[in-house]
């Protein structure tokens, strides 16, 4: 867990520094931090995964469910679009409330 947390913190720091360094060139830099996403490779879809495991993972999210891949894609599309033309140097959470559940 320490390596994961350090990697995530490093990514956020890199985004902020790059945004400051190249913002004058009209280049935006952001990160998308997704929560648990219901994909074929998700732990909840692994062979032998139980309903209890799914309930546990969903329970970590304030919305009490995992994201659908399209929901994460929509967040990425927003960051890549002109709708976010004044957004830079940020780490956008699309985690269904996992980050607030732990505070």
Language model features with spans:
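Short C-terminal tail/terminal secondary-structure segment
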Residues: 77, 88-103
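Catalytic tyrosine of NAD(P)H-dependent dehydrogenase/reductases that use a Tyr as the general acid/base
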Residues: 4, 12
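Conserved catalytic loop/helix region of short-chain dehydrogenase/reductase
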Residues: 1-3, 43
């Amino acid at each position: 867990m320490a390596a994961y947390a350090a990697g995530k913190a490093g990514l956020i720091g890199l985004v902020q520094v790059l945004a400051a360094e190249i913002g004058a060139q009209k280049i935006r830099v952001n990160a998308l931090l997704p929560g648990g996403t219901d994909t074929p490779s998700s732990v909840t879809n692994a062979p032998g995964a139980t309903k209890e495991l799914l309930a546990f993972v969903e329970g970590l999210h304030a919305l009490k469910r995992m994201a659908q891949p399209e929901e994460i894609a929509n967040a990425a599309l927003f960051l890549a679009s002109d709708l976010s033309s004044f957004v830079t140097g940020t780490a956008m959470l699309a985690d269904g409330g996992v980050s607030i559940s732990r505070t």
